[in-house]
Amino acid sequence: MAGAKEIRTQIKSIKNTQKITKAMEMVAASKMRKAQDRMLATRPYAEKIRQVIGHVAMAKAEYKHPYLEEREVKRVGMIIISTDRGLCGGLNINLFKKAVLAMREWHDKGVEVDLCLVGNKALGFFKRLGGNVVGKVNQLGDQPRMNDLIGTIKVMLDAYDEGRIDRLVLVENEFVNTMTQKPRATTLLPLVPSEEDELKHHWDYIYEPDAKPVLDTLLTRYIESVVYQGVVENVACEMAARMVAMKSASDNAGDLIKELQLVYNKARQAAITQEISEIVSGAAAV
């Protein structure tokens, strides 16, 4: 058994760590509420543009935009949104598992995958994995801006326009609630409506002055908005996961302190008993 002094030092060290985790928990809780507000503020625009794009995808326009046409998949582009920092539980690991599983499925079909990475954690992980990284952006902070993402998104859109990739997939975290964040993979390009949507569709758009410039701008804005929404939502996921992880760490530290306090009391009691025994033995010898 360790001595009372060593145990006391351990208890002090754990208490200091507990103070840090509690502070991080409170900071994450505060930032999470702000991140949720930003996420909710961006959703109406994202949902509306998704609705418009859904209608456009079903329209029978004379000009068929390349983003609306499905083609044989020889190479896939994948945008993966992670965090810049750790200490957020299994948020990034679960996301990477989802991405790696999707990559393996494509590789099994003989399809190569190009990666565009958002966040330091994804960059570090997929570089170690040996992934083909063609674009990256990090250090977006707790209040990401669209302008910081446009250059990275353009790399993938240019690759799609030039035929270097035939499908664009977004891998992100979905904010379900404070306790639950789920990784998901969504196909961004091509935009192909389902058969059910086509059966419900009974109208069309008239484009002025011309369909091409309207669709070029609208579809690009759509992709940018979806990726930006994913980044904003990922910040909320990060803060929620960090808050839960730090609360768990604080609770575990409290349990460990209680256990060490019990061990300390036993060690102190044993030392006192030994001292009394030595005093009694000495008195008897005299």
Swiss-Prot record:
GO CC aspect terms: plasma membrane; proton-transporting ATP synthase complex
GO biological process: proton motive force-driven plasma membrane ATP synthesis
Chief location category: membrane
Bilayer topology annotation: Peripheral membrane protein
Keyword Iron-sulfur applies: no
UniProt keyword list: ATP synthesis, Cell inner membrane, Cell membrane, CF(1), Hydrogen ion transport, Ion transport, Membrane, Transport
Compartment list: Cell inner membrane
Cited Gene3D superfamilies: 3.40.1380.10, ATP synthase, gamma subunit, helix hairpin domain
A Pfam match: ATP-synt
Any one GO molecular-function label of the UniProt entry: ATP binding
Database matches in InterPro entries: ATP_synth_F1_ATPase_gsu (IPR035968), ATP_synth_F1_gsu (IPR000131), ATP_synth_F1_gsu_CS (IPR023632)
Record function comment: Produces ATP from ADP in the presence of a proton gradient across the membrane. The gamma chain is believed to be important in regulating ATPase activity and the flow of protons through the CF(0) complex.
Family the UniProt entry places it in: Belongs to the ATPase gamma chain family.
Subunit organization: F-type ATPases have 2 components, CF(1) - the catalytic core - and CF(0) - the membrane proton channel. CF(1) has five subunits: alpha(3), beta(3), gamma(1), delta(1), epsilon(1). CF(0) has three main subunits: a, b and c.
Name under which the protein is recorded: ATP synthase gamma chain
Organism of provenance: Thioalkalivibrio sulfidiphilus (strain HL-EbGR7)
Taxonomic placement: Bacteria, Pseudomonadati, Pseudomonadota, Gammaproteobacteria, Chromatiales
Designated gene of the protein: atpG
